[in-house]
Amino acid sequence: HAPAVAQLVAFIERAEQTALGVANQHGVAALRDNPDAMGTSLDMLRRAAATLLRLAEHAANRPLIRRHERRLLSLVMSQILDQKVAHELADVLFHC
């Protein structure tokens, strides 16, 4: 599961970085009107966060997720990331 956790976190980070770029260049309204401009859909981001949460609910996976604790915390505190995604990631940290 270690590569899966790293890939899921990286996927969310890439979307956040792209969203920041779109927001800086075109404004937050452009991102709100067209969330797919971040390179993926909100649904896929929410699924990635939900998958991380399901993994975190199993004690055996928690050490794998703890390796990415700082990255997850950074995403939780993001000003641009979808609030549902951020909330799920906060729950991931809570379980770990």
Placement of each model-derived feature along the sequence:
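Alpha-helical solenoid repeats of the armadillo/HEAT superfamily
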Residues: H1-R67, I80-C96
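Amphipathic alpha-helical scaffolding segments
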Residues: R67-S74
